[in-house]
Amino acid sequence: MTEFQIKEDGRSMIPSVFSHAGKKELVLLQYPQLQALDMVKHCFTTRMGGVSKNEFSSLDLSFNRGDDIEAVKENFRRVAEAMEVPAGQIVCSDQTHTTNVRKVTAEDAGSGLTKERPYHDVDGLITDVPGLMLATFYADCVPLYFVDTKHRAIGLSHSGWRGTVNRMGRATLKAMAEAYGTVPEDVWCAIGPSICQDCYEVSEDVALEFEQEFSGHGSEI
């Protein structure tokens, strides 16, 4: 899971390991460049530091894979504690491989965690509300982080192969531009951990879609 939050007071990157020690030790990944902005809190969770058992061990953050619901809630509480944010301020995506982006407001706090989501089919979240924590979820897909330092707004998007070929990054920036006046020159971007090209095989049909959409970059596909 990836989480992202604007601090209350507040382009090539390699994540570093952040450990939240104590009885609830977590191993999280963070980007030093985003931390240095002193505007956002963020992390990419690993499987370590939770309470889930067996095939869900241990930091399972999914409510729909058959894990014990209370264990998942405790895992969320541990991440929230490490990020120093109430769990009720987390806002979760509803990922279905779209390029839909939701403007998150204070009324959305807790959506997908402490209350039902008032939205569906949302793979990108944006906000300029301090204190809200955006959360998206990953297996082998790509997390995209956006920080508009001028307008103090953030975006967090899930981009699988379908989202990538449909330009999820562009859709997120467009949504931020419409909502906050964001322009690319003011935005720091980061690409989170995902599967590598050596481990991800696609069908000929999928490869053809990429060739057609990114015809000017054929040698890189």
Each model region followed by its residue ranges:
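Active-site microenvironment for binding and transforming phosphate-containing groups
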Residues: M1-I221
